[in-house]
Curated annotation (Swiss-Prot):
Its cofactor is Zn(2+). This is Endoribonuclease YbeY. Belongs to the endoribonuclease YbeY family. It comes from Yersinia enterocolitica serotype O:8 / biotype 1B (strain NCTC 13174 / 8081). The gene is ybeY. It is found in: Cytoplasm.
Amino acid sequence: MSQVILDLQIACADSQGLPTEADFQHWLEAVLPQFQEVSEVTIRVVDEAESHELNLTYRGKDKPTNVLSFPFEAPPEIELPLLGDLIICRQVVEQEAVEQEKALLAHWAHMVVHGSLHLLGYDHIVDDEAEEMESIETEIMQSLGYPDPYISEKDPE
């Protein structure tokens, strides 16, 4: 049986209105068991200042971002279920949901799904890989009862 272990860290001043730990767990469980038996993930919800600092340090981008993924790389002789860390910026997620006309909870779910796929090695730099990743994201989001994250909820179908 697959197991997903979540370490949730809330590092922003106001935790009011954030998804629950059960929400984050549910979203991880929709992704990870498809790929590996046991997974341990840390999700850290941060403010814009911390996101900005990490994005600048690790990606050279001078702005906060929605989600950063840091895969854990164990030495080959050590087997650990640690998959890595997701850093999600509350303000950016909330702002994007408004701008993209998406339900806030659906956008949070998408950030967890998207970041988890990065931890598993998926990327969207090359077009073919982007299409594959987006297809997997859409399928997982729909299995969770959310719409296609790449279509605005107000777009005609």
